[in-house]
């Protein structure tokens, strides 16, 4: 069981109410009462993830903080300073509530398949096509693997023609990671060695990068829904024990994000992404893949549901239903039609679906097939020949 206190602390996300934290860049929704109104679902979400949390204690501490918060918002000049001190004294009530994971929409029951070991690293190294930098835990490719890598990257972009290409920052502040409830120990901290430099992480193409441009955004009626964006390039994580195309700290990825006004619309987006990615890997690249709905214990904190497209136990792509969990924390809203006699004003927080495909892992499995005597698709062979 994972102790609750090991969950991410939200001091940067809640900097406005904590004091002495990082530069304030996020203004999350702090009215979390609706989360505690769904106690049964919250307990299921925690049990699924193997998290031990005293929900009643967290709720009581949060209620005390929120009561003070409401007084602070309505306070006059004479009492506002004292109430601000009380808010900071009761900060754990807010921080522990913000650390709670997303509720579970649905979870799969299939066990994680047995991972078939990969032989691509030894093969490519012997061919002089890959060099492993063990000190920095990265790999360097030359020759035809680079050609195939670039081809897959371009084809994944073409796979989602409705997604607008963007080039997000490769860096994200701690508050962004906390808004996504991501374990910061899995990311690479970055500094310029000055004492005043804010806590920042090198993330590359990732969920923090692709959501950051929309921080504190309010979409209007003129936007075409769903709003969708995509990016490709290097993604970065902290060091792992194994260094190869599937586990290096720098890997090539394709990321796509959909934002919708309707939770019901997410189902169609998820199904379409599953079909597109699965068909591309299976039919386009001749990889034998299976789509699996992940179990609750495999869900990331920001996910309410997730599917993985796997080849012999190796996850090549992940489709994540997020809902409005992240948008409430990054303050990404939409404004709809004004209220009428028959309907209420349609404002709210956007609903999200995120798809991340690991290009380097796909390349690794293609090389594994080659080692086993399986020919790659003809168009890949033709592209390789042209590169020489």
Name what the model sees in each region.
Residues 34, 64-67, 110, 115-388:
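TRNA-recognition modules of translation machinery and tRNA-sensing kinases, especially anticodon-binding
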Residues 2-131:
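N-terminal alpha-helical targeting/anchoring segments
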